[in-house]
């Protein structure tokens, strides 16, 4: 039966994906959010989903309310619902109930969740009817789907309402220092989550923290080294992507190609191959559809302006920065790699300052944008982006949105914009600068 859903904070990456999914399943969907433009709203607008400013008038008692995790009691719509005793569910609680109707495939991990969820969704939807929810704001819903693929987020232990049949865990790393106290706290959260997986876990076997995970369901380890249950080997990385074989229990189960770059994407693909193999999906079909994966939003997204290659990536943790630069070097081995990075949150910048500097030294030149503070924190003046610049060995400087012209001082370069804040404003400024150069040269 069709329902009416109202999303409070509909532009969030998970919320927008869920809204799209429910819309495609035939439900009436609307939502509210701040006026600022987010890349997620394009898909909502294309689907004809109404996006409203926050107002008490948006809510009627017959609606099912889904509230984004960033919105608390000081939001006027949340306050109205509480005052009038109109029930609502948080995003993760709704998802925990929703998945009970499907055979569910989850992807968890500190890094690589969105790319791996996108890859698993792409392969499975091309083999059989599948609903999915990806952290880049993409969602697909089918009333007849047997399978549901989704991204499982560890922040504030939001994945605890989830009890999937299968789950990949890509890695464990210290992140979200505003919530987690250290790596042991992160590992404990993942261990609690792992105990809820019903049929099987697929865990990166070369991660020391992940090796400590214990769960009632069988754990299959994947990676490059002997001793893993699923081993990627005979690897060839070219400017067209990555080719490799996978063996399980000493037997070759297939030869694969992914049009993606970086070692991390070979691992992501191996996790997907392992999961679908154990779930009984034809490996030959999996290999066919891996070849056609075009990526997910804001993960190594490329464009060319005035013969200049620009890469946009969500990387906002040192591990992700290293992986993104590695991918850029694989695809463009003869070009200078210029990194433009915006630190995301003051707490993360303070906690990982040395690691950020070390990661950015993998680039040939570095430009830094001002730190993007989270809505959850206040700038106490404890760290400035210049503190990071001082620790970087490679040539580096701070740029502003108004003046990105120093980026023009490079020939034969690939420009890699990385961050989870508003780094795209800097990217757009650079694109306008390049476009104006073209006009002036005509």
From Swiss-Prot:
Job description of the protein: Cell wall formation.
Record keywords, A-Z: ATP-binding, Cell cycle, Cell division, Cell shape, Cell wall biogenesis/degradation, Cytoplasm, Ligase, Nucleotide-binding, Peptidoglycan synthesis
Listed NCBIfam families: murC (TIGR01082)
Reaction catalysis annotation: UDP-N-acetyl-alpha-D-muramate + L-alanine + ATP = UDP-N-acetyl-alpha-D-muramoyl-L-alanine + ADP + phosphate + H(+)
Gene Ontology CC terms: cytoplasm
Family: Belongs to the MurCDEF family.
Localization, UniProt: Cytoplasm
PANTHER family: UDP-N-ACETYLMURAMATE--L-ALANINE LIGASE, UDP-N-ACETYLMURAMATE--L-ALANINE LIGASE-RELATED
InterPro entries for this protein: Mur-like_cat_sf, Mur_ligase_C, Mur_ligase_C_dom_sf, Mur_ligase_cen, Mur_ligase_N, MurCDEF_pg_biosynth, UDP-N-AcMur_Ala_ligase_MurC
Pfam families: Mur_ligase, Mur_ligase_C, Mur_ligase_M
Residues the record lists as binding ATP: 109-115
Keyword Cytoplasm found: yes
GO biological process: cell division; cell wall organization; peptidoglycan biosynthetic process; regulation of cell shape
Catalytic activity, EC: 6.3.2.8
Pathway in which this enzyme or protein is active: Cell wall biogenesis; peptidoglycan biosynthesis
GO MF annotations in UniProt: ATP binding; UDP-N-acetylmuramate-L-alanine ligase activity
Broadest EC class assigned to this enzyme: ligase
Top-level taxon of the source organism: Bacteria
Protein name: UDP-N-acetylmuramate--L-alanine ligase
């Amino acid at each position: 039966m069709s329902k009416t859903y109202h999303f409070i904070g509909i532009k969030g990456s998970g919320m927008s994906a869920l809204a799209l999914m429910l819309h495609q399943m035939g439900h009436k969907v609307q939502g509210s959010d701040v006026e600022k433009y987010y890349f997620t709203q394009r898909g909502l607008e294309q689907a004809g989903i109404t996006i409203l400013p926050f107002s008490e008038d948006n809510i009627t008692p017959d609606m099912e309310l889904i509230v984004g995790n960033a919105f608390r009691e000081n939001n006027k719509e949340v306050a109205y619902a509480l005052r009038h005793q109109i029930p609502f569910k948080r995003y993760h609680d709704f998802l925990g109930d929703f998945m009970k109707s499907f055979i569910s495939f989850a992807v968890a991990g500190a890094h690589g969740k969105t790319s791996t969820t996108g890859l698993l969704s792409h392969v499975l939807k091309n083999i059989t009817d599948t609903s999915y929810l990806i952290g880049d704001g993409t969602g697909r819903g089918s009333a007849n789907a047997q399978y549901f693929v989704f991204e499982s987020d560890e922040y504030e232990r939001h994945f605890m309402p989830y009890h999937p049949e299968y789950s990949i865990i890509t890695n464990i790393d210290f992140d979200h220092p505003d919530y987690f106290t250290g790596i042991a706290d992160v590992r404990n959260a993942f261990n609690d989550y792992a105990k809820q997986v019903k049929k099987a876990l697929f865990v990166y076997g070369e991660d020391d923290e992940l090796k400590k995970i214990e769960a009632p369901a069988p754990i299959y380890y994947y990676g490059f080294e002997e001793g893993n249950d699923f081993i990627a080997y005979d690897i060839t990385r070219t400017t067209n992507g990555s080719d490799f074989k996978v063996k399980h229990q000493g037997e070759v189960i297939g030869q694969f190609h992914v049009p993606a770059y970086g070692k991390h994407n070979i691992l992501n693909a191996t996790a997907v191959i392992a999961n679908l193999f154990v779930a009984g999906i034809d490996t030959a079909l999996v290999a066919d559809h891996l070849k056609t994966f075009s990526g997910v939003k804001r993960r190594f997204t490329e464009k060319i302006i005035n013969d200049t290659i620009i890469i946009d990536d969500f990387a906002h943790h040192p591990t992700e920065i290293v992986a993104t630069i590695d991918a850029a070097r694989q695809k463009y081995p003869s070009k200078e790699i210029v990194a433009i990075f915006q630190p995301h949150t003051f707490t993360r910048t303070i906690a990982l300052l040395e690691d950020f500097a070390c990661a950015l030294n993998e680039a040939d030149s570095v430009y830094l944008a001002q730190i993007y503070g989270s809505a959850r924190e206040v700038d106490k003046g404890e760290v400035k982006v210049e503190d990071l610049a001082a620790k970087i060995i490679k040539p580096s400087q701070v740029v502003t949105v108004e003046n990105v012209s120093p980026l023009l001082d490079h020939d034969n370069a690939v420009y890699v914009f990385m961050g989870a804040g508003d780094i795209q404003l800097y990217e757009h400024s650079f694109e306008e600068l390049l476009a104006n150069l073209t006009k002036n040269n005509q």
